[in-house]
Amino acid sequence: TTRQCLLNPNRNPTLSEVQIEEAVLESLGGEKLLWVGDGLLNDHTDGHVDTIARFVHPGVVVAMEPRTADDPNREVLATLIRDLESLTDAKGRRLEVVRVPSPGRVLDDAREVMPASYVNFYIANASVVVPTYGSPFDDEAVQRIAALFPGRTTRGVNAKAVLAGGGAFHCITQQKPQAGHARQQSPAPIPGPIPGLTS
């Protein structure tokens, strides 16, 4: 998760980082929570992590890297990659970071920078839908993400209109694992709402 999101005063003003981490791990049956810094500029979600990095396999994370000098997220993404490369997963493995390009400077109709992200893709049972933005990096991003999901059809779909409302395809969908693909060991049951914790 990002510190920008879960430590934002508008979300969990009375909880410390340690308290938030304990609540998340207990609720999800997790063993380790990986923290990174900030999300994308102008992100409607206060920096949800699914706009900057995604686990694609155990120990393997896909993240965007800036390719242009005018990328509005140049510093955030460079820091993210450096941070991810220094982290280990719950099994103690150093993360493998697969880089895809950032779409760069994507503007809305009012000429404001949009929080455009290729890693906010949606994974369906037999396909992957990658958000695109009419950027010169669209095709490369779709190809690189497709290589991470052999056996699935990967398509790029323009997401500018969706993004204008907040988030792209992963943000606007609710994923449900296919039957038979659950973890070997079930996580702890999710309790009711955690007092004071919002995501």
Indicate where each model-derived feature is located.
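The feature marks the mature, well-folded catalytic cores of soluble enzymes
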Residues: 1-190, 194-197
